[in-house]
């Protein structure tokens, strides 16, 4: 399996001297979806910024596709252009990414800098249609709903066909319909062979991941989402599904519960197995 990122003993301090990350080690592989979980202030967004080359660690090493990622390397215009084409960052607040007069202009911004005008127009129109927001192309981004803005910000990244997509809380503050649409998008990214790293508090979203890391300055857990229930979830400030809370309560009451489901389908599966025993 091709290694996309490798972080070795990465530490980072904020300008005020407080620690954001402390000796973080992790690996991310091609075509993986990896979730980064943890309480507020755990360093999750800082980690994404390091993966995106927006900030660099005070200590430790970051490798992208086997090559060391440094400030000096990204000062090279050609290397920076290639890295930016391969890696896209979707910020938690889409407003920070939206600064053009229309949705079409937003999505076309990067293609117009990377491709010929003809190809840029073609790629932009295709992206808008694929994302089902072509009808919004002449609208001003600030007049859109939260879910529509999120789709536009994701479209801005997809228009340059990145291989890696970094997403900071992609479903936060969205209504259930918009949340479901974003989750389906993330599923489609994996099907297209893309690598996705997402920061989230939402266990339902994290269930899309092949693996997850729990951060609290350091890596305190690495593994499958279903194995998270061995940790103190209250301390991690995670959005735990109600069905999971129900099974945790039943287990604490003494019932023979060996698995904690995250989705309704998983819960039905577990209950069916229990009924078969009686």
Curated annotation (Swiss-Prot):
ATP binds at residues 38-45. Its main location: membrane. Probably part of an ABC transporter complex. Responsible for energy coupling to the transport system. Signal peptide: none annotated. Its EC number is 7.-.-.-. It is found in: Cell membrane. It comes from Methanocaldococcus jannaschii (strain ATCC 43067 / DSM 2661 / JAL-1 / JCM 10045 / NBRC 100440). One of its GO terms (cellular component) is ATP-binding cassette (ABC) transporter complex. This is Putative ABC transporter ATP-binding protein MJ1572. Belongs to the ABC transporter superfamily. Residues 5-242 form the ABC transporter domain. GO terms for molecular function: ATP binding; ATP hydrolysis activity; ATPase-coupled transmembrane transporter activity. It is a peripheral membrane protein. InterPro entries: AAA+_ATPase (IPR003593), ABC_transporter-like_ATP-bd (IPR003439), ABC_transporter-like_CS (IPR017871), ABC_transpr_CbiO/EcfA_su (IPR015856), ECF_ABC_transporter_ATP-bd (IPR050095), P-loop_NTPase (IPR027417). It holds the Pfam family ABC_tran. It comes from the Archaea. Keywords: ATP-binding, Cell membrane, Membrane, Nucleotide-binding, Translocase, Transport. PANTHER family: ENERGY-COUPLING FACTOR TRANSPORTER ATP-BINDING PROTEIN ECFA2, HEAVY METAL TRANSPORTER.
């Amino acid at each position: 399996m091709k290694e996309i990122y490798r972080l070795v003993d990465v530490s980072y301090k904020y300008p005020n001297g407080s620690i954001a990350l402390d000796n973080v080690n992790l690996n991310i592989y091609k075509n993986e979806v990896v979730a980064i979980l943890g309480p507020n202030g755990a360093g999750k967004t800082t980690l994404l910024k390091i993966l995106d080359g927006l900030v660099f660690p005070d200590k430790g090493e970051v490798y992208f596709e086997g090559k060391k990622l440094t400030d000096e390397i990204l000062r090279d215009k050609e290397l920076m252009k290639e890295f930016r084409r391969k890696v896209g960052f979707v910020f938690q607040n889409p407003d920070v990414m939206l600064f053009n007069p229309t949705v079409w202009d937003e999505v076309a911004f990067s293609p117009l800098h990377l491709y010929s005008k003809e190809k840029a127009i073609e790629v932009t129109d295709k992206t808008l249609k694929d994302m089902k927001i072509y009808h919004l192309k002449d609208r001003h981004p600030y007049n859109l709903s939260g879910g529509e803005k999120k789709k536009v910000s994701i479209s801005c990244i997809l228009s340059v066909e990145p291989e890696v997509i970094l997403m900071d809380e992609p479903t936060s503050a969205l209504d259930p319909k918009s949340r479901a649409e974003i989750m389906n998008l993330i599923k489609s990214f994996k099907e297209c062979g893309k690598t996705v790293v997402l920061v989230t508090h939402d266990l339902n979203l994290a269930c899309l991941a092949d693996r997850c890391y729990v951060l609290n300055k350091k890596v305190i857990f690495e593994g499958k989402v279903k194995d998270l229930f061995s940790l103190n979830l209250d301390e991690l400030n995670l959005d735990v599904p109600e069905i999971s809370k129900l099974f945790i309560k039943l287990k604490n009451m003494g019932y023979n519960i060996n698995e904690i489901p995250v989705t309704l389908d998983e819960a039905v599966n577990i209950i069916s197995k229990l009924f078969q025993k009686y």
